[in-house]
């Protein structure tokens, strides 16, 4: 199973390079809201991978804190600072066979492209802080093929309630 999370809403206001852009206040609130809502899913995770971009790392740390995921399960990977999706796929396929449940914090268009290619539900756009959970019937990540989209959860889903 893979839990894919797009980083929360980030700021363009500071004069910093793209990689260093921080989360906006809205992004911080969305990450809190979404991660607390996921507690009910009782996710059991073996590994958490995050892009090393500031906005993805911050989103990941909020989720990990609220979901009580141990810090030693997280790895930063510059290859996930990927917008096309080729590196995302490579990172997933190279995961150890002992990793059954994986959580990834990354970027668009890589995430939307991945969930549409490997899930069974078409999603126009995974929004900032959007979560998509996919399940696969495989023994090794390198054998990745079409899976099942188990869940989509976007910030607007929780705000409209």
Question: Where are the regions a protein language model picked out?
Answer:
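Active-site-proximal alpha-helix that buttresses catalytic centers in soluble enzyme cores
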Residues: 1-79, 121-129, 161
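Short glycine-/acidic-enriched loop or helix-start segments at secondary-structure transitions
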Residues: 14, 59-60, 86, 113-116
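Residue-level signal for well-ordered alpha-helical positions
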Residues: 62-63, 117, 137
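Short phosphate-binding loop-to-helix
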Residues: 80-96
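A polyampholytic, Gly/Pro-enriched intrinsically disordered region
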Residues: 93-103, 145-156
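Non-DNA-binding regulatory cores of transcription-related proteins
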Residues: 95-103, 108-130
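Domain-level recognition of soluble alpha/beta enzyme cores
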Residues: 121-155
